[in-house]
């Protein structure tokens, strides 16, 4: 029956395909959670039961320093290499999040995690001792939202009672991976951002949570031809615009229906580009807008130029600042939109452009 209906037209609209799918599956199926062109509204409640943030000394000295769970004055975290230090942060964050959720890691069915390093080195070694099934993810600095999205889908779909999302970044390991060795002393342009040394972990479940994930809008890859790896904000802003506008259209909301629309690490340069791009699409989000990369450092005293970046930037800010405000009811609904620049050493050295991606998670006060 489904195959017959699908053959009727190769150019059917999204609404037509959605109707066919619902007829085939039944109105009580997971298909009925599809919203608009690329969003999902969870009918079965998904809650954040626990979260944790682990940061290095520079982040601890910033404006959000007092709110982080674990602050280490040693950027090596007692290890021998930067990569090992990043793995240690993930291990600590995941264990701390489970403790705050009053769970053993053995009760977490699936882990969704990733980082910025080749072959997800920090994640592979960081959570090996957890001994839980892992889905390794690479979404660059959007990985926090990507992991939350997939973890929420697994919980809402009944595939796991509890799932965890974890990600990290480290200034030194990222510089080593994508730019120049620290000893080289390369000068940074003002459009550059500072990779956050930090890890955030989140435990999702069907009950006993304090913030609800009510929906998600997975993002598309958007490439506007930018090639400057020292201006990540310009690379990622078009993708952020695309996802934010699609979320508003899919859920039929106005920007003011969110207390905050928060991107991950566009920084001061990307912020201005995003606000103009969104305005060109017919929305004004300036009143609600916030960026984790702008919040996490003081550029005047910490010499971070355009702001913070990295997978850890959005993750630790979500855990330390955004979730507590939602929990207290200071904010009722937040659109959380981490952004990622999808480059590698190979693609950049071959002269390729730097595409961007952004995933959106709708967070609500319980």
Question: What label would you give each PLM region?
Answer:
Residues 124-176, 180-192:
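A generic, well-ordered mixed alpha/beta core segment in the N-terminal half of proteins
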Residues 161-164, 197-202:
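Generic beta-strand structural signal
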Residues 191-195, 352:
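Short Gly/Pro-enriched turn/cap motifs at secondary-structure boundaries
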Residues 1-8, 15-112, 116-135, 200-366:
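Conserved "HGTGT" condensation-loop signature of ketosynthase/thiolase-family condensing enzymes
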């Amino acid at each position: 029956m489904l195959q017959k209906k699908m053959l009727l037209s190769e150019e059917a609209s999204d609404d037509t395909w959605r109707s066919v799918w619902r007829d085939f599956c039944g109105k009580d199926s997971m298909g009925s959670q599809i919203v608009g062109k690329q969003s999902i509204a969870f009918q079965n409640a998904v809650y954040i039961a626990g979260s944790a943030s682990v940061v290095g000394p520079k982040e601890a000295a910033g404006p959000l320093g007092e709110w982080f769970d674990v602050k280490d004055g040693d950027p090596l975290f007692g290890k021998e290499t930067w990569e090992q230090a990043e793995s240690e942060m993930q291990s600590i964050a995941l264990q701390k999040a489970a403790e705050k959720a009053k769970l053993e890691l053995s009760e977490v069915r699936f882990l969704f995690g990733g980082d910025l390093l080749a072959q997800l080195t920090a994640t592979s070694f960081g959570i090996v001792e957890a001994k839980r099934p892992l889905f390794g993810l690479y979404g660059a600095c959007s990985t926090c939202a990507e992991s939350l999205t997939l973890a929420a889908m697994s919980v809402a779909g009944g595939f796991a009672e509890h799932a965890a999302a974890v990600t990290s970044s480290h200034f030194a390991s990222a510089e080593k991976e994508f730019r120049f060795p620290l000893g080289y002393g390369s000068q940074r342009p003002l459009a550059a951002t500072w990779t956050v040394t930090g890890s955030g972990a989140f435990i999702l479940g069907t009950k006993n949570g304090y913030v609800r994930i009510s929906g998600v809008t997975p993002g598309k890859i958007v490439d506007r031809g930018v090639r400057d790896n020292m201006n990540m904000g310009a690379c990622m802003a078009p993708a952020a615009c695309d996802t934010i506008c699609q979320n508003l259209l899919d859920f039929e909301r106005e920007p003011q229906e969110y207390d905050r629309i928060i991107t991950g690490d566009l920084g001061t340069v990307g912020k201005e580009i995003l606000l103009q791009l969104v305005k060109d699409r017919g929305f004004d989000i300036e009143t609600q807008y916030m960026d984790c990369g702008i919040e996490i450092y003081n550029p005047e005293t910490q010499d971070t130029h355009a702001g913070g970046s990295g997978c850890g930037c959005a993750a630790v800010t979500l855990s330390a600042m955004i979730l507590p405000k939602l929990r207290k009811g200071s904010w009722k609904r937040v659109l959380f939109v981490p952004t990622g620049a999808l480059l590698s050493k190979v693609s950049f050295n071959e002269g390729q452009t730097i595409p961007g991606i952004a995933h959106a998670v709708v967070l609500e006060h319980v």
